[in-house]
Amino acid sequence: LAKREKLRILLAYELRKQVVTRLVERIHNAERVNDMKQSMIDRLNELGGQGKPFVFCLDYEMSELILLEEPLAQQELLFDIGGVTNSLARSVSDTPAVLRAIPISEEAYAERFAVIRHALERGDSFLANLTVATPIELNISLEEVFLRSQARYKCYLPGRFVCFSPETFVRIVGNEISCFPMKGTIDATLPHAAETILGDYKETAEHYTITDLIRNDLSRVSHHVEVRRFRYIDELVTSRGHLLQVSSEIVGQLAPDWRAHLGSILSELLPAGSISGAPKEATIRAIAEAEGEPRGFYTGICGYFDGETLDSGVMIRFIEQQADGGLRYRSGGGITINSQCAEEYREVCQKVYLPFV
């Protein structure tokens, strides 16, 4: 009995030691991550304060920053942001683009959906953006996708990803900061498409939630925050036809010295509310559990600072290249307590498309 008791005490001690060791490792890892984040913020603040132009991509986890000065002269990252581009004239083939998707199974999606559903039922979240990665095959290069895509925010990093996003993160002109969260799409050819999407209860509830979240986020960095436009419609041209996209515009006023705090402002607003959810911190934890892998640059942000103004986008509509050369198309959608798994699964599958005809 004495030997057993000694063994039990020894095992308990070893277990506690392992737990403490793992806790210390997590603390050290967290400190390293925080140091990296602060370094990125400081660098953005520095360049903004100096009025130096740059282009950047910042990943969802805020663990990797691509930051290039003299953005129009470099060719490491091809970009076209709000019509400003470093993409030199290149010939584009007239080969019809063919994208073949190999979707994850509905059962696999349902497992992720169940994690989010449980968080909603517990009250941890009332809107969460659940995303998936769909393996695809393409008959054209990612550079060709970049060149042929029609989108306000386009980035191509060879060997890593191409992004062709319609969604603005923030624009800053003068001292005014603006956000344009997107929530809700519908096939533009459907009868009464605009009336249908604007009258949809679930879409309306999601839009109210995300607009309120963004308004609160902007209030952390600016004053006189207001919703200037609520649920207006844009039309998108895609390889699957025309879509109607619902957005809102929220604006605030920054302090005159905002350029010297540009990195800090962006950090306060990240991750974007439209691709995370509300309340943000608890929802991010639920998303991480459900998705089971880092998002990387997908749903991060890209932007161009010309020394005076900033234009940045949320990196949705995104194809990533894996180490073995395989391609994955990332897509997602907002989940609420009223969401149906089968409908959400269809939506993420339908979002796998190219933004050109």
What are these regions (language model features)?
Residues 11-357:
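Extended alpha-helical targeting/anchoring segments
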